[in-house]
Amino acid sequence: MLKALCLLMLLGASVAASASGSIDTFMQSKKVIVYTDKAELCFADTKECHPVLIGKTTPKGRFDLQLYSTEKAGYGGDVIGFKQEKDFLFALHRVWTLKPSERRLERIRSPLVADRIMTNGCINVHDEVYEKLKMYFVLEIL
């Protein structure tokens, strides 16, 4: 009886470790990559790439993504944060359009990378890209 109980406990621990490993593997596979030299975001699993607006201060590195609710105007109710520095949250969010003179919707469609480097460090994406990003866990900025 004791042997069976020990075996069951070992199997349970093994299954839990295996499940945990599978979850980690899955989460790491749900990665997006931003290429700052191209001002482009690519989904690692599907290889789909999309233009983005970025800034000269957009931090490089590997970050976990976290969905945040916000009531601030222009963000559509939420943003996907990836790095906090003092009072500033670097985030992926829908194209911010509250300052029409910045022409962000026009600039994100531009084939010129220089036109798409203009934010304060956040990464702006089209609405449909943003909705898809909610299913991803890791951001790598190169």
Q: What is each residue range found by the language model?
A:
Residues 15-62, 141-142:
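Intrinsically disordered, low-complexity
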Residues 56-66, 101-104:
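Short, surface-exposed linear segments at secondary-structure transitions and domain or protein termini
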